[in-house]
Amino acid sequence: MIYSVSDINERFQLLHRCMMKAVQRRRQRKVANAKRKTYRQRTKPELPRDKNPNYWQSPWGQLVKRLASIEGGPCISSRNGKLFRRRFRVPYQVYCKLVHMCLETKLFGENSALEFDIANRLICPVEIKMLSVLRILGRKWNFDDIAEATLMGETTARRAFHLFCENFVTHYYDAYVYRPKDQKLKKMMEVFSKMGLPGCIGSTDCLHRKWDKCPVNLNQVWSGKEGYPSLAYSCTVDHHRRILGSTSSFYGARNDKTIVRHDAYITDVRNKKVHEDVDYKIFIKGVLTTVKGVYYLCDGGYHRWSCMINPIKHTISRSDRLWSEWVESTRKDVECTFGILKGRWRSKKRYCATKSIIY
């Protein structure tokens, strides 16, 4: 097919007009995007961030310097000591001990003790990171709120908090949560013997903590008798409210009978692997009898095991009713422990926002 010169010119003009329209539309899109970007910058300005801040010039950095300048640290009964304990929920001496533990075992990571990182930027000091962890645990601050008082970024605060919780449990769980032996066990039994419960060394119960942001597809699995998704923990304490054993988190739909089967401490006591040689004397039908083994006080939702004594719910016997009232009046140690923890650390009192804060 042969085209004439006029046809060829007409086709070139049509192609040129199409190209010019495409270029014009592209220019219009650029102008519209520029206007939209300018509007976004005008309505939501981004504040410039100092990528190498001096953390010691922050409010909490000045606080650490001021308290460290006091010889021997602030006294617990002094104004500064009371103010520090009220704001960060622990005495200043305990805070110094935690800082020393973090430096010794590197709870905040391998580079936490260094002053500068590989890019020659100032690393946030361990003292300020420890204050941020205490504030999050004690007053349930958000991670972005920490930046206002420490000049520390939200990502750094989140990473420091999770590293501390994970590493602290790994290194120091056995140092604070351990099974009593010898003299300590005898002293614990003496306390309960004076209350009329020979052979008892503590009480156990389960704590259900609300999980607010539970996925919808897991609501039924994690919801129990409370009516909302929760995380269940089993805990055993003595009369002085020292924790003897605890478990990790379980589904909120599980009851106390199921959770206690996974408690290693209770299982060992039941199977006579620990405290099997401990003996005490009680009256059985008027005869003084020596019994071996120990037991714990619990509520009526547990198994009828010999190592777990609970009050009798339905009885017509006067002696059984008096025994149940006596046990109920002394079964307050584990409940008081939960109350003390919630009062000291507000992060335990409120709901659990994310599952990543479970250790």
Predicted features along the sequence, with ranges:
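Active-site-adjacent structural elements in folded domains
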Residues: 115-119, 129
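Alpha-helix N-capping/helix-start residues
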Residues: 92, 126-127, 154
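Short, well-ordered secondary-structure "scaffold" segments embedded in the functional core
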Residues: 142-359
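Short alpha-helical segments in extracytoplasmic peptidoglycan/chitin-binding modules
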Residues: 91, 132, 146
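Short, amphipathic alpha-helical "recognition" segments used to contact nucleic acids or chromatin
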Residues: 126-139
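Charged, often Cys/His-bearing segments associated with DNA-binding zinc-finger transcription factors
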Residues: 1-116, 170-173
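Extended, leucine-rich alpha-helical cores of fungal transcription factors
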Residues: 122-123
